[in-house]
Amino acid sequence: MAVKIKLTRLGKIRNPQYRIIVADARTRRDGRAIEVIGRYHPKEEPSLIQIDSERAQYWLGVGAQPTEPVLALLKITGDWQKFKGLPGAEGTLKVKEPKPSKLDLFNAALAEAESGTTAAATTPKKKKAPKKDEAAEAPAEAAEAPAEAADAASES
């Protein structure tokens, strides 16, 4: 029986996601698989390529023929070079940086809040009210002084 390593398509329109499978060469594209050995998501940045290297090596060793797209993926992961005994078995696969967990982000923000900035606001508030009060107090004091003098004169 001729065995091929090929892709089966999953996902929505314009968002393809593939499984890398081992299947009989006569089965249709999304037909019955002998074994699923990986997955490929081309729309992610960088593309997600996960292949079970041990199982891929086994199937290549027993004569399974990869299709052209799968061959390209095997070269990226380094499995094809490993199978053929060529240099570059580490592959050229780019791995996405893991996102920090929400708990780590929360703890970092909490530590920053506890250790940090209890100073005044960065933008100083406008001090319009004291200027108006000083200007209003000066004429009021001037008006009170003659009135006090008049009160003192009338009491004596």
From Swiss-Prot:
Top-level taxon: Bacteria
Entry-linked PROSITE patterns: RIBOSOMAL_S16
One Gene Ontology term from the biological process aspect of the record: translation
One CC-aspect GO term: cytoplasm
Record carries keyword Mitochondrion: no
Family annotation (InterPro entries): Ribosomal_bS16, Ribosomal_bS16_CS, Ribosomal_bS16_dom_sf
Compositional bias annotation for Low complexity: 113-123, 137-156
One Gene Ontology molecular-function label: structural constituent of ribosome
SUPFAM superfamilies noted in UniProt: Ribosomal protein S16 (SSF54565)
HAMAP family hit by this protein: Ribosomal_bS16 (MF_00385)
Protein name: Small ribosomal subunit protein bS16
Annotated organism of origin: Mycolicibacterium smegmatis (strain ATCC 700084 / mc(2)155)
Gene from which this protein is expressed: rpsP
